UniProtKB/Swiss-Prot annotation:
Superkingdom of origin: Bacteria
S-S bridge residues: 92-191
Residue numbers spanned by region Interaction with tRNA: 138-140, 293-294
Transmembrane domains' residue ranges: none
Protein name (Swiss-Prot/TrEMBL): tRNA-specific 2-thiouridylase MnmA
Catalytic activity, as annotated: S-sulfanyl-L-cysteinyl-[protein] + uridine(34) in tRNA + AH2 + ATP = 2-thiouridine(34) in tRNA + L-cysteinyl-[protein] + A + AMP + diphosphate + H(+)
Active-site residues, as the UniProt record annotates them: 92 (nucleophile), 191 (cysteine persulfide intermediate)
Source organism of the structure: Helicobacter hepaticus (strain ATCC 51449 / 3B1)
Record carries keyword Ribosomal protein: no
Gene: mnmA
A Pfam family reported for this protein in Swiss-Prot or TrEMBL: tRNA_Me_trans_M
Keywords linked to the UniProt accession: ATP-binding, Cytoplasm, Disulfide bond, Nucleotide-binding, RNA-binding, Transferase, tRNA processing, tRNA-binding
Entry's family note: Belongs to the MnmA/TRMU family.
Annotated NCBIfam families: PRK00143.1, trmU
Annotated GO CC locations: cytoplasm
Amino acid sequence: MKVALLMSGGVDSSYCAHLLSSQGYEVIGIYLKLHDKNKKHDIYIANCEQVAAHLHIDFQVLDLREEFKKSVYDTFVSSYKEGKTPNPCAICNPLMKFGLGLQKALELGCDYIATGHYAQIKEVNGIKRIAKAVDESKDQSYFLYALPQEAIDRIIFPLGALLKEDIKKTALELLPFLGTLQTYKESQEICFVEQSYIDILKLHDKVDNEGVVRNSNGKAIGTHKGYMHYTIGKRKGFSVFGSHEPHYVKAINPQNNEIVVGTKEELAIDSIKALNKSLPQAFNGGIYDVKVRYRSTPLKAQIDIQGEFIYAKLLESAYGVAQGQALVLYQEDCVLGGGVITQAQ
């Protein structure tokens, strides 16, 4: 059986190459060139080539920079301009890695596509679903909620049942040269961000632009340094005159360059509206676990699907729910689907 492995040049995907080869798969390594950080590409492509040579597998580079810019990068920038908090990985996965990446794999005659994601594939009532990784501290199933079924049916996640701490140790024991691979210093999980997302936005717009902070009643109570610096739930980086209690961002008004802040109690919401990306009608009316951001604790919610929107009525309040983030539904450890949050109140 032939499998296309999306390689990043790091230890995890390199170890995947070893695992798949040792399991008898014919492996073709593919590096996706997604952004314009050429120094980063040079380092990681060289790493991939070294791994491929060591394991005697084919390797190639797929240049998707133009498609990535249109579908992921530009959406990232425009979302912040609109006062939203985008989730670029959740956009990239269905369109780039498991969209155009899978398309390339099929063109190469591959039966499957594999990645180093920490997630699993589980079969439920004859349907394959994305499921949480055994190592829940590294679980990435949240970012994979929008994958089409035709992609899920062809995915292999070699690391899904393993622990991160064991992987690195075992990988370096089996493939000692992995310890000599170059790395690229970065401080963000977002591949095209070097230091802060603000640095990206500054390339496209005036970000540092002092504005008014208002309370829930509309009264001006302070100042901020520019609305794009803030996300819902943030409690630092703005001033509130004469107040010593914590205030949190509860709304962003791009048109007037204003933010609205309130106490934690005022931040509480219990209903969410999301643009449906992948939740089947079969789950309409049920009560499921939902996550509203990557590291959030799952909450129970009653689900109502109407047209192209998902309405989630939370059974307990949530805090810091931002437009642009993903609403992801789970049943036990399996992902059912989800959408992009458009409203929370």
